[in-house]
Amino acid sequence: MRRNRRAVLWGALALALLCGCGGEQDASQRHSVALVVKSTQSEFFRSVFAGAEAAAAEYNLELSIAGPETEEDYETQNRLIAEAVRAGAEAIVFSAIDQEENAAAIDAAAQAGLQIVTIDSSVDSDQVSTYIGTDNYAAGQMAADAVLDRVSGPLYVGVVNYDVSTANGQERERGRPTPSLPAAGRRSPRWSTH
């Protein structure tokens, strides 16, 4: 429940930032924002949609929502970014599947004049104006500290990183204090959200 409230807040906050909430805006002027997420099937991102739709209504924004069905399909994300540019979006709110493979598409959108806001998982681009999400490095440290506080004696950890191609997955793993919590093994599963 807490994660869903956070998702709704992220969606609303991202759109509010883009519209310059509180600034003077002609009531007839509608700005166009594309929300491109990791998966349209994810419960988390469905909550983001709810927040984004509420903010779009409140701030008179034209909102398009798109994303691949699974969280592995960065090629579809790149195509959707290009489609948003062609459709005349003024901004993209984006959650990257692959921080490196999505970078060129985000750079191209920014060069076309779009504002870029990333949520949940950013992209390897200096064109991102705002990131809204968790401090994933600190979250990794907190998780490791919680384990270390509860266990005495030798400890061997198996690291299962949900997706090493995402910025948030990499940062959470980097937050693990390696000397005091050595990894006995490391895996990155691939699974579908269906």
What are the language-model segments listed below?
Residues 1-19:
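Sec-dependent bacterial lipoprotein signal peptides
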Residues 21-194:
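A residue-level marker of the well-folded mature domains of exported/periplasmic proteins
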